[in-house]
Amino acid sequence: MAAVLEVEIGGEAVREAAGEEVDLSELAPEERWRVEHARMHAKHRGHEAMHAEMVLILIATLVVAQLLLVQWKQRHQRSYNMVTLFQMWIVPVYFTVKLHWWRFLGIWFLFSIVTAFVTYKATRKPLVQTTPRLVYKWFLLLYKMSYATGIVGYIAVMFTLFGLNLLFRIKPEDAMDFGISLLFYGLYYGVLGRDFAEMCADYMASTIGFYSASGMPTKHLSDSVCAVCGQQIFVDVNEEGIIENTYRLSCNHVFHEFCIRGWCIVGKKQTCPYCKEKVDLKRMFSNPWERPHVMYGQLLDWLRYLVAWQPVIIGLVQGINYCLGLE
């Protein structure tokens, strides 16, 4: 029995018999998509029970994977963070090479070179005095760039949804591609930069000696020394600095502005680097224009699971479906 596939193209009905293939290369992109979409529906017609099984497998795998990841993070947080960071760094590269997204690959390569150099400097012993400020300035710059890129991408997406792109005679698909690309760049490099900054912060702070992940610090902190970078503080808390200001936490310990911003916002540390007292970020950054940076950092934490682990879980689900003969 010959199956007949009907696709509406340009107002005319195009019939594709079972032995008669339509040359997709001669069709416009939208028409080609319609033909492929109709073929997919014809292929999966009558597979409702099989599709229901696949949905149940997907839901069960997501629930089990989430429980396992939570337990792993609670019991062995260090290994969990390292594996997550590695996947965040490697997994998107596989898709970019497969889809020939050379622009993303070039930016990723440049980011990897600079970040590898900064990470190498941060993990050396003895630690050079200028290294902590170099590290925090780089990751703080990267964080602000990713934040700005994400905001521009979000605005571009919203403008497209409201049709404002037509005022500039920009096609909706071009405007949406531009916005989503910028949004992805901002979120991806924001997450990746924060994870590298957290790792470097632990190495540097423990090397300097004023901070220890577990136990007492190996050095005593004087009133005029920053516990993050170990260098002298010359600007008083009440004075306006030329390059940067000095911040005092609720525990009365003082730090350089770049250092404590890098430690708390970029490095994801919510405690004092010396005494481990809880830091109130809303109190420390009282300016309302600075608070979105804190909320943006929390958003990046939520999205880490989607970028690092979601492709792995989807791949596992596809493997299960393949073994069970589901399509």
UniProtKB/Swiss-Prot annotation:
Key words, A-Z: Endoplasmic reticulum, Membrane, Metal-binding, Transferase, Transmembrane, Transmembrane helix, Zinc, Zinc-finger
EC number of the protein: 2.3.2.27
InterPro entries: RNF121/RNF175, Znf_RING, Znf_RING/FYVE/PHD
Catalytic activity: S-ubiquitinyl-[E2 ubiquitin-conjugating enzyme]-L-cysteine + [acceptor protein]-L-lysine = [E2 ubiquitin-conjugating enzyme]-L-cysteine + N(6)-ubiquitinyl-[acceptor protein]-L-lysine
Enzyme class of the recorded protein, top EC level: transferase
Role, per record: E3 ubiquitin ligase which accepts ubiquitin and transfers it to substrates thereby promoting their degradation by the endoplasmic reticulum-associated degradation (ERAD) pathway which is a pathway involved in ubiquitin-dependent degradation of misfolded endoplasmic reticulum proteins. May regulate the unfolded protein response to reduce endoplasmic reticulum stress.
The protein's name in its UniProt record: E3 ubiquitin ligase Rnf121
Originating species: Xenopus tropicalis (Western clawed frog)
Gene: rnf121
